[in-house]
Amino acid sequence: TERGSLSIRGIVISNHGARQIDTVKSAVQLLYECTRALKKVGWLGRDDPEFSVFVDGGVRRGTDILKCIALGARAVGMGRPFMTAMAAFGEEGIARLADILHQEIIVSMRLMGCRRLDEVKEDVLDTRALDLPLPGYIRSRY
């Protein structure tokens, strides 16, 4: 199906961080599968401003954000870390968390040899484990 005929501008991949039900795939695993499928049918290109993938669920660190970007996400949502920072330290906690995440992203990008976010691509990740089904995932009767 042609994307334009459906007026689809993007998708949101969201779950509960895969904490609630065992054998459920994490948001990162689903992101990996979805972006591979979207690329295969020509709906997702790295520089395509007309289609975006957003993801959230289980994102806790700057490295998690970079992994999602490398796998094709245009934006990454975080809930729990910001709620915890707000509850514990108020506005200062939010600002401090944002600074920590920023520093984690900058340091990780330097270690990967990337100067800009558009240089963070899937080939900087070891995705072999994402190709494997979770134990019991396919055979589970629950």
Which role does the model predict for each range below?
Residues 2-6, 71:
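Structural motif
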Residues 18-24, 61, 84:
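Short, small-residue-enriched loops and turns at beta-alpha junctions
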Residues 29-56, 60-142:
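Alpha/beta catalytic cores of nucleotide-metabolism and tRNA/nucleoside-modifying enzymes
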